[in-house]
Amino acid sequence: MVLAGLLLHYSLRVFVCDSFVVNGVSMEPVLHSGERVWVNKLKMGARIYADYNFSKPKLSSFRLPGFSKVNVGDLVISNYPYAKSHDTITFKINYVYLKRCYGAPGDTVRIVDGYYLHPQTGGRIGDLTYQKKLSECSDSLLAEDGVVIKALQVNKSLNWTIRNFGPLYVPRKGDSVKIGVDTYKTWRRPILFETGERLYVRDGQVFLGEKPISLYTFRSDWYFLGGDNVLNSKDSRYIGLFPESYIIGIVI
């Protein structure tokens, strides 16, 4: 009976739902550090490890069939993709993030005057408490409070900040993007993750490995995840996109 109970317990955690404790302030005021959340694994399908050697830099897994995808506005639990290097996506099993989805595969993410805009409707999304503060406070005042204004720089000429960010396309499996000298840095880490080869420029031409490239078709879905406390959250605004395979489940 004890063995059967343990088997049922762990089967439910792997295939159906699991709980996680919130750590940090990045999801305030919606969720606070120390709160426990439950994650639905059935919705998008439970992620099953194909290899239990977690010392490897790349996750080997597959996902069981689910009945829904992650939608904009959903809260998700995900493994953090840049635990070992800011330049390369790697897997670390016990390093998990709780964030809100602000961009699903095929969406284009924009932040205007501190507010996230819904990819389809253009309306403001997420909890607006800290977005309002970001919109109204000066950069100098935010800097005094330790807020990092400068965001992910995929192109130095764009000068993105957490106040004004994008547009950034969120790749969807099967979609193709143009790869040029001015844009290759946007896709460098996702493409390295998918192919194992680096994008670089040589003699004015972009190469993937040893082959010139001008168009790339994505092999997987990607997500833009962010914290509701936009003044204190290490998320896609700073570090880039999250691969679908790293998402554990959707918060109930």
Locations of the language-model features?
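Extended hydrophobic leader/signal-anchor segments used for secretion and membrane insertion
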Residues: 1-252
